[in-house]
């Protein structure tokens, strides 16, 4: 059984955490994650809690993810990769968003940047859609997959519109990770040909038990789970906790391993920068 304060005792399994904001976490968290079997972390660029006012604030943040967090993870034997983008929440400041997106190419060239993200919708606004389209084209230019943030409110409508835009842009759906799915949207994401990400963040998203229900219904093909651990009431060990729940339900080890390792590694390997 997992015991958070004792770090973890768990049957060995390779784990890739495909979405965690480790810049908001402590070194204690890195140590616990390593002991739980997490070998790889993908850290997406996103909102920091306080809306930024200047393009340079984003560039310093991107440098921090690419540089310092990469080294900090390595201290605990964890390989860290990054996704870089202008997030949808702050893209509603059009001038700021344009200035940031204009400079993204120099960050997307970095060899451990493995996707463009998080992009997508927050308020499902025109400004967010404009920023989304520009960054999809950057992903195409750099041969990178997309990590897409689906909105917390009106999620079904938001994902439906995002899929429509991607269809108009003729972006390959096998290179799309539609994240933060719930019971009402998983089927839509999968049917479109995208990968379906799910965030186990019990207070505002889904619990390990709900995630296990989704796996029992939809299987494991093109499915992923993550903690999206950040500065909120989250836990970077939610993937290991969900593994325990899946085992309790009788899901076979090979399927769990595919869900928490093979799938995220296969998706991000489309960048040509991870193996």
What are these regions (language model features)?
Residues 218-236, 256:
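Short acidic/histidine-rich active-site segments
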Residues 133-217, 221-224:
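Catalytic pocket-lining loop regions of alpha/beta-barrel enzymes
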Residues 74-76, 168-172, 217-219, 248-254:
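Short helix-capping segments at alpha-helix termini
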Residues 2-9, 240-275:
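Mid-to-C-terminal alpha-helical segments outside catalytic/metal-binding sites
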């Amino acid at each position: 059984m997992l015991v958070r304060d004792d770090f973890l005792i768990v049957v060995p399994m390779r784990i890739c955490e495909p979405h965690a904001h480790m810049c908001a976490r402590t070194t204690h968290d890195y140590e616990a994650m390593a002991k739980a079997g997490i070998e790889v972390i993908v850290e997406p660029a996103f909102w920091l809690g306080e809306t930024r006012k200047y393009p340079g604030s984003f560039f310093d943040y991107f440098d921090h993810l690419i540089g310092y967090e990469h080294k900090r993870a390595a201290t605990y034997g964890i390989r860290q990769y990054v996704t870089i983008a202008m997030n949808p929440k702050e893209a509603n400041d059009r001038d700021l968003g344009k200035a940031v997106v204009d400079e993204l190419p120099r960050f997307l060239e970095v060899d451990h940047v493995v996707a463009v993200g998080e992009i997508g919708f927050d308020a499902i606004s025109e400004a967010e859609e404009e920023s989304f389209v520009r960054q999809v084209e950057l992903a195409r230019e750099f041969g990178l997959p997309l990590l897409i943030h689906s909105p917390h409110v009106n999620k079904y409508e938001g994902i439906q519109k995002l899929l429509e835009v991607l269809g108009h842009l003729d972006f390959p759906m096998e290179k799309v990770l539609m994240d933060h799915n719930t019971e009402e949207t998983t089927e839509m994401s999968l049917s479109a040909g995208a990968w379906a990400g799910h965030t186990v963040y019990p207070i505002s998203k889904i619990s390990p038990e709900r995630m296990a229900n989704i796996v029992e219904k939809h299987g494991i093909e093109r499915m992923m789970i993550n903690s999206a651990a950040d500065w909120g009431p989250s836990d970077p060990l939610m993937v290991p906790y969900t593994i325990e729940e899946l085992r309790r339900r009788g899901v076979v080890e090979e399927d769990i391993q595919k869900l928490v390792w093979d799938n995220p590694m296969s998706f991000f390997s489309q960048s040509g920068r991870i193996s």
